Amino acid sequence: MRDARRATAGATFAAGGRVEQVAWDPFVATTLVAGDETGGVVARAARAAAAPLWSLRAHGAAASAVCFSETAAGLLATASADASVKLWDCGGAPGPPAPVAARDLAVGELFALAFDAVDPLVLVAAGAGGSVALWDAAGDDGAAAAWLAAQGK
């Protein structure tokens, strides 16, 4: 990682494999996550080269997409070449996030993922063969509970 405002290189760190995607936590501006080709996801403090904040094996195949909800603090989504999308609660105790919900979207390997800008529990993912799938996770009790907790309810 390099801070473009400085002439010298910033903090660098290794992931578990080739990095597929990175995302900033919109509620903790110095935290970023990276998903890698092994299915691992690692969180780091951007200004420190120390040990990761946490890491986990999120998927059985490449963690091809990672993104944070911009409306529900601590809600992370990951998508994978294993065709699944998983939601994680990063807002709790230190250490790896707790799993919240998972869904196989039945569109093959997944390559892109995003939260809806208005509804914090609706996600869209793009898969192999040009397929796009929507998942309204509000019907999943774990996802709904995580969102309510993020809202302080």
Predicted features along the sequence, with ranges:
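Terminal intrinsically disordered, low-complexity extensions flanking WD-repeat/beta-propeller proteins
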Residues: 62, 72, 84, 90-153
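A conserved positional marker within WD40/Gbeta-like beta-propeller blades
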Residues: 31, 40-42, 84-86, 131
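Short loop/turn segments that connect beta-strands within beta-propeller blades
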Residues: 4-7, 46-49, 90-93, 138-140
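Detector for outer-membrane/organellar transmembrane beta-barrel domains
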Residues: 40-44, 49, 53-55
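Loop/turn segments within WD40 beta-propeller blades
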Residues: 23-29, 66-73, 79, 114-120
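WD40/WD-repeat beta-propeller blade N-cap
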Residues: 6, 13-19, 49, 56-63, ...
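Conserved strand-to-loop turn within each blade of WD40 beta-propeller repeats
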Residues: 4, 35-38, 78-82, 126-129
